[in-house]
UniProtKB/Swiss-Prot annotation:
GO terms for cellular component: Cul4-RING E3 ubiquitin ligase complex. PANTHER family: DET1- AND DDB1-ASSOCIATED PROTEIN 1. Belongs to the DDA1 family. The modification Phosphoserine is found at residues 33, 95. Component of numerous DCX (DDB1-CUL4-X-box) E3 ubiquitin-protein ligase complexes which consist of a core of DDB1, cullin-4 (CUL4A or CUL4B), DDA1 and RBX1. Component of the DCX(DCAF15) complex, also named CLR4(DCAF15) complex, composed of DCAF15, DDB1, cullin-4 (CUL4A or CUL4B), DDA1 and RBX1. Part of the DDD core complex containing DET1, DDA1 and DDB1; the DDD core complex recruits a specific UBE2E enzyme, such as UBE2E1, UBE2E2 UBE2E3, to form specific DDD-E2 complexes. InterPro entries: DDA1-like, DDA1_dom. GO terms for biological process: protein polyubiquitination; regulation of proteasomal ubiquitin-dependent protein catabolic process. Keywords: Acetylation, Phosphoprotein, Ubl conjugation pathway. Pfam families: DDA1 (PF10172). This is DET1- and DDB1-associated protein 1. It comes from Mus musculus. It comes from the Eukaryota. Disulfide bonds: none annotated.
Amino acid sequence: MADFLKGLPVYNKSNFSRFHADSVCKASNRRPSVYLPTREYPSEQIIVTEKTNILLRYLHQQWDKKNAAKKRDQEQVEAEGESSAPPRKVARTDSPDMPEDT
């Protein structure tokens, strides 16, 4: 292995002084780590990346959660008020089918 490194341009020759060819062989005998999935995903599944920024997406989610709570509280107040108040829509008294006198 020293013959292979001979002739290469280096600034500090001591960088290669501790190199031993035996250590390379021992390291290559190890089996590489392999990822084994725990779930089975369909092969036709398409992975799509989101175009929005992660920070913007997070802020929108927080804003939606905050507004959902406010909206829910407002709906409860309106529901309580509707039971005692008359309906907002009132039936029309004049019928559009009747011709007007001119």
